[in-house]
Curated annotation (Swiss-Prot):
Compositional bias ranges of the Polar residues kind: 351-366
One of the protein's GO biological processes: translational initiation
Record-linked SUPFAM superfamilies: Initiation factor IF2/eIF5b, domain 3, P-loop containing nucleoside triphosphate hydrolases, Translation proteins
Positions of the UniProt region annotated as G3: 595-598
Keywords noted in UniProt: Cytoplasm, GTP-binding, Initiation factor, Nucleotide-binding, Protein biosynthesis
Region (G1): 548-555
Composition bias type Basic residues, residue spans: 427-437
Name this protein carries in UniProt: Translation initiation factor IF-2
tr-type G domain ranges (all copies): 539-709
Gene that specifies this protein: infB
Family the entry assigns: Belongs to the TRAFAC class translation factor GTPase superfamily. Classic translation factor GTPase family. IF-2 subfamily.
NCBIfam families tied to this protein: IF-2, small_GTP
Function, as annotated: One of the essential components for the initiation of protein synthesis. Protects formylmethionyl-tRNA from spontaneous hydrolysis and promotes its binding to the 30S ribosomal subunits. Also involved in the hydrolysis of GTP during the formation of the 70S ribosomal complex.
Annotated segments matching region G5: 685-687
């Protein structure tokens, strides 16, 4: 039989190195490995050498076990414990160190006990010398009560070790009611124990048996019970070493043998039957102990309460005495008392207010260390005189604390502080000090006013009318989404770059707790609006805006009405510009149509169209549903207070279902006239012209109801529909005249641009001399591209126009500075936390202002938490050299929408490495920028498990390390994979595969159910049964 070295070291309580060294000395070669196996012969040699270490370990374990049992079972021991103590030493293991320690203190004589008290019959035997030896044994437990606990602990231990003793224990427990059986359990162990003291014990117990029947009724004192029990315990513990004399340490125990014998004789002379065990108090349960604790706590609380009431009464008495001073105290004594009282108050206040300062307290001593350290009385340096009062006075001092708390109020503190300050400032009361004080007060007041003013101004927004939603959000330091949500809650659909009017700005700002102040008021007042006399007003043509979802047939309808093909000229077959057309019907009446884009990017254009229009035609395709842009167009029209006419298009298609559209409109609370509502609707086919004339009739009917009038004989005012930069003609603006007549040669002021009208064209590009109310026109001669949606006015002189535009430019610059987003510390922290934060700077150039606005709006919307899109510049016209240099300086890309770079700009871009992207369709521009943003995102690493391998055998190969012989359970393991070692479901190691072999050949991969040899880089902990999981890391492209 072989035994592992690990087990041997545990059994013999020695280290592996010690065992290996010893065996080598004896001529055995053994590896210093815990799993090394040794023969029985080697084991016998080790046992012979290290048996003492083994015994020591067993002893210590036994001692620890006894101590733990002692703590668990704290019960008193009667004779049963005494008997068990005798029998317990049967175990061969001798407690060498512990027994002498227990025995020594127990023989120290402390006092004497008169044993004659127990019974008269035993006096004959007890009168001899043994009495003296009993005294120390009996008295000692009284001093060291834990002895009783020790004996109790040994009771369960003996039960577990010696099974034969269990019946004896049961009989011994019945000692009090039936004492007769006590003799049997004591007699039984006698043959097993050879020592003489045990025989003496037997005699003693026999005597007890004889005496018991006569003295059962007597009830001696409890103290005597305890003494007798404890003597029994002591003798039991002392006899233990006598039974273990077979061990090597006989010498130690021989000295004590005669003493032990004498003590045993003495115990035999005590009448144990006279002790009534039933009088011993029972061990209290946890519940009883808890009740006792609660009762004590209750008593303590009651005492505390009574003490508190007494203190309060005392305080009140003192207060009443102070409040009613005697009549006799009008002399100097009364004054002195009063002064003392005030001083006392001051001291109390200071104690409360400055309790943390270095004022000396009673029983504290200040030293080099600084601070007050409480010291016990009489233990200061030198231990000098203690100037402490007697206990009575100390109690008084202790009771004064609540007095302070009750007397001191905030008013008293304030009064005290005031008096102190007044006392401090009275020094040197001359004119200069008064003057300085007044000056300081004035300065502090001024500072306070400035602070208040700044606080008030921080909540006031200084802005020009028509700031965009994005700029407003920046000024209020809130998210633009919140501003848009607020606008939607009041029934307005706005986009990020849509300019808001004054009324909307006021509402939104008030919602966020800001006040508005329009700094352009003086500029607005510079242009005086003329009131028209009713007799000057003449009927004008209605302005009708066609709105709806993309591809629902808006432009097709206008093409039919105008007998033109606009769609063919639009890139991608979708409208990307707002168009204004004046159409004359067969009966001679005129209608001005505005065609708006349906794509979601053109929200601002639709809003602008709804703002300047009189009537809105909402087109819905009969073979489709009411789409999001349709709903948005309806909301824009409703917000502008414009009458709506629904045109249900494409009714000629086989899949058309006009009733379904009417049902969806009814669900949105727009009930058509056919269904008993107030909104007119017409089924049409824009391609074939079905129902178009009826639609015109209904539109003109709405116009008649509105009674539209204007004064053509005055200076023109109106709106900028679109503006662009034409290569041959310069800046061109499409305008819609709302009042007056615009003529060639008029000085037009629009936003920050102005100029003399050099030429005018209608929508068919035919030159015209003038444009009346509700007529669109294309004007040339402006010095810049005005923003779409701006109003234009005709002014008298060029100088007036220049002054107003200069002021507006200044305001625009100020507004730009105010709305410029500064990188805050919070934003910087957010970017650092993200780790891979990116910024994409874009310069947008387009052919018309509306398209530039729509495109930049859509690009800003693409911003995410990880990538922020910044449109650092946007403008109308071709891509110039200045755009390229700006892009090179700010690492931006240039997006051109239906514009091309000039030759010089293209060459410069090539040199500087600036990326210029040119688009004709807004969809393409948005999609490509989105793809570029996704490319900026760092790819995600994902793990894909390729195989699981089970280790069947582990080989330790020199210079290679551990190699596992394994079987591929699932999948296919590749040489390039990474691997993790798993043991009992826990990952032990993760790393790369060092080698993958099959029959001594290196292989690239091993399939399922094939065996292979595998080793991992720097892995030296493999065991049979471990699992190896192989995986590969795949880069996954992130999406927005």
């Amino acid at each position: 039989m072989t035994i592992r070295l690990n087990k041997v070291t545990r059994d013999l309580n020695v280290g592996i190195a010690t065992v290996v060294e010893f065996l080598q000395k004896k001529g055995y070669t053994v590896e210093a490995n815990p799993n090394t196996k040794i023969s029985e012969e080697q084991y016998a040699v080790l046992v012979k050498e290290f048996s003492t270490d083994k015994n020591l370990r067993l002893e210590s374990e036994r001692f620890i076990q006894e101590r733990q049992n002692k703590e668990r079972n704290k019960a008193s021991v009667s004779i049963e414990g005494f008997e068990k103590q005798q029998e317990k030493p049967k175990s061969e293991d001798v407690i060498k160190t512990v027994v002498p320690e227990d025995a020594r203190p127990k023989f120290k004589p402390v006092g004497k006990i008169d044993l004659d008290k127990f019974s008269g019959r035993r006096t004959d035997k007890v009168e001899k010398a043994p009495e003296k030896k009993v005294e120390p044994v009996v008295e000692q437990p009284v001093v060291e009560q834990p002895v009783a606990e020790k004996t109790v602990v040994e009771k369960p231990v003996v039960e577990s070790e010696v099974k034969k003793e269990e019946p004896k224990v049961e009989k011994v427990e019945v000692i009090a009611p039936k004492p007769a059986p006590v003799e049997q359990p004591v007699v039984a162990p006698k043959p097993a124990v050879e020592t003489k003291p045990v025989e003496v014990e037997k005699v003693v117990v026999e005597e007890v048996k004889k005496e018991e029947p006569k003295v059962v009724e007597t009830a001696p004192v409890k103290a005597e019970e305890r003494k007798v029990e404890r003597t029994a315990e002591v003798t039991a513990t002392v006899t233990t070493p006598t039974e273990e004399n077979a061990s090597k340490e006989n010498e130690v125990f021989k000295i004590r043998q005669p003493e032990l014998g004498a003590k045993i004789n003495v115990i035999g002379q005590i009448d144990l039957a006279a002790l009534n065990q039933s009088t011993r108090p029972k061990k209290k349960s946890k519940e009883e102990k808890r009740r006792e604790r609660e009762e004590k706590e209750k008593v303590r609380q009651d005492q505390k309460k009574l003490m508190k009431e007494a203190i309060i009464k005392e305080i009140r008495k003192e207060d009443s005495k102070q409040a009613k001073p005697g009549v006799k105290d009008n002399n100097a004594d009364a004054a002195r008392k009063k002064r003392n009282r005030i001083n006392k108050e001051k001291v109390d206040v200071n104690n409360v207010a400055t309790s943390n300062f270095a004022a000396p307290r009673p029983n504290t001593q200040t030293g080099k260390g600084g601070g007050n350290h409480p010291r016990p009385q009489g233990q200061g340096q030198g231990q000098g005189n203690n100037n402490n009062n007697n206990k009575k006075n100390n109690n008084k001092d202790r009771f004064k604390k609540p007095v302070i708390k009750q007397e001191v109020s905030e008013e008293d503190v304030a009064k005290q502080v005031k008096e102190t300050l007044a006392r401090l400032t009275t020094k040197g009361k001359n004119k200069t000090s008064k003057y300085r004080k007044e000056k300081r007060e004035m300065a502090s007041n001024r500072m306070q006013e400035l602070e208040d003013q700044e606080m008030a101004e921080s909540k006031v927004l200084k802005l020009t009318e028509f700031v965009t939603a994005n700029e407003l959000a920046t000024m209020m330091d809130v998210s633009v989404n919140q501003v848009i949500a607020t606008c939607m809650s009041i029934g307005m659909m706005v986009s990020i770059n849509q300019r808001l009017d004054a009324e909307t700005i006021n509402l939104v700002a008030e919602e966020f707790g800001f006040k508005t102040e329009y700094v352009s008021a003086e500029v607005a007042q510079a242009i005086v609006e003329e009131e028209d006399a009713p007799e000057d007003l003449q009927p004008r043509a209605p302005i009708v805006t066609v709105m709806g979802h993309v591809d629902h047939g808006k432009t097709s309808l206008l093409d039919y009405i105008r007998k033109a093909n606009v769609i063919a000229g639009e890139a991608g077959g979708i409208t990307q510009h707002i168009g204004a057309y004046n159409v004359q019907l067969e009966d001679g009446r005129r209608i001005t149509f505005l065609d708006t884009p349906g794509h979601e990017a053109f929200t601002a254009m639709r809003a602008r169209g709804a703002k300047v229009t009189d009537i809105a035609i909402i087109i819905v395709a009969a073979d489709d549903n009411v789409m999001p842009q349709t709903k948005e167009a309806i909301n824009h029209a409703m917000a502008a207070g414009v009458p709506i006419v629904f045109a249900i298009n494409k009714v000629d298609k086989p899949t058309a279902n006009p009733d379904k559209i009417k049902e969806e409109l009814a669900a949105m609370n727009y009930l058509v006239e056919e269904w008993g509502g107030k909104y007119q609707s017409q089924d049409i086919s824009a391609k074939k012209g079905m129902g178009v004339e009826d639609l015109m009739e209904k539109v003109l009917l709405e116009a008649e109801m509105l009674d539209l009038k204007a004064n053509p004989n005055r200076n023109a005012t109106g709106s900028i529909i679109e503006s662009s930069l034409d290569k041959g003609r310069g800046y061109v603006a499409t305008v819609l005249v709302s009042n007056g007549t615009l003529k060639v040669g008029d000085i037009v002021l629009a936003g920050t641009s102005y100029g003399r009208v050099k030429a005018m064209f209608n929508e068919r590009n035919q030159r015209v001399k003038e444009a009346g109310p509700a007529e669109p026109a294309l004007i040339l001669g402006l010095n810049g591209a005005p923003a779409a949606g701006d109003t234009f006015h005709v002014v008298e002189s060029d100088q007036e126009a220049r002054e107003i535009t200069n002021k507006r430019e200044q305001l625009a610059r100020e507004q730009g500075l105010r709305t410029q987003k500064i990188l805050t510390l919070d934003e910087l922290g957010r970017r650092i936390a993200l780790g891979n934060f990116q910024e994409l700077n874009i310069i947008v150039k387009g052919d018309v202002d509306g398209s530039v606005e729509a495109l930049s709006d859509s690009l800003i919307k693409l911003s995410t938490e990880q990538i922020q899109v910044n449109v650092i510049h946007k403008g109308v016209g071709a891509i110039s050299e200045s755009d390229v240099s700006l892009a090179a300086a700010s690492d931006a890309i240039i997006v051109g929408f239906q514009v091309r770079p000039s030759g010089a700009a293209a060459k410069m871009a090539e040199q500087e490495g600036v990326d210029i992207r040119k688009y004709s369709v807004i969809y393409d521009a948005i999609e490509e920028v989105k793809a570029a943003m996704e490319g900026m995102l760092a790819p995600e690493l994902k793990e894909q498990i390729t195989a699981t391998i089970e280790i069947r055998e582990v080989f330790n190969i020199t210079k290679v390390g551990l190699v596992a012989g394994a079987v591929v359970k699932t999948g296919k393991v590749k040489r390039s994979d990474k691997a993790r070692l798993i043991r009992d479901g826990i990952v032990i190691f993760t790393g790369n595969i060092n080698a993958l072999k099959r029959f001594k050949d290196d292989v690239k991969e091993v399939g399922t159910n094939f065996e292979c040899g595998i080793s991992l880089v720097n892995c030296n902990d493999m065991k049979v049964g471990d699992m190896i999981e192989t995986f590969e890391e795949i880069e996954v492209k992130q999406t927005l």
